[in-house]
């Protein structure tokens, strides 16, 4: 009985395949040795990302591609506050309320104030202070109604139209540069000093030298 040649051929082919794989190395096997890719090389691993750029707590809530430089110029401006009130002049009162602009408080960052006006440049975060003060005024004529059947009157008022940020340095707050003492009386022209005052000064000098 002659053995079949098919199993022998299969064994020879498997043996030849294993010999070829051993010559190329075991790195050619992929997917748990179920697929042979002889031309596939090793890919380099990507470098690990820096977690500090992704941490928004360290970047002040800003995206990592928009770094904030403390030396950059940032805008400061006043907050726009409108105040509506009635004008009075004695017993008379305006027929309609008047809306005016109120400038008060410190200047804040313009990016945080959507309705900001009067923008200026702020060069240093720890630099001089800025205050919001009136910049321009507008004149408006208001009609006043008086009680008792009196004829209405008109009055011209001055209202704030815009505000601005004024720079206040440390020089404005130095109290030693200000003279809080009594103002010296200026000598008046055409008048002679009184003799009584001159005698009082002379007597005071004699009393001081007596001891």
Curated annotation (Swiss-Prot):
Glycosylation sites: 51, 173
Localization per Swiss-Prot or TrEMBL: Secreted, Extracellular space, Extracellular matrix
This protein's UniProt keywords: Disulfide bond, Extracellular matrix, Glycoprotein, Heparin-binding, Secreted, Signal, Wnt signaling pathway
Signal peptide interval: 1-23
GO biological process: BMP signaling pathway; canonical Wnt signaling pathway; cellular response to parathyroid hormone stimulus; negative regulation of BMP signaling pathway; negative regulation of canonical Wnt signaling pathway; negative regulation of ossification; negative regulation of protein-containing complex assembly; negative regulation of Wnt signaling pathway
Keyword flag Glycoprotein: yes
Disulfide bonds: 78-132, 92-146, 103-163, 107-165
Start and end residues of each CTCK domain: 80-170
Cellular component, GO annotation: extracellular space; Golgi apparatus; protein-containing complex
Phenotype on disruption: Mice were resistant to mechanical unloading-induced bone loss.
Protein purpose: Negative regulator of bone growth that acts through inhibition of Wnt signaling and bone formation.
Protein name: Sclerostin
Species for this entry: Mus musculus (Mouse)
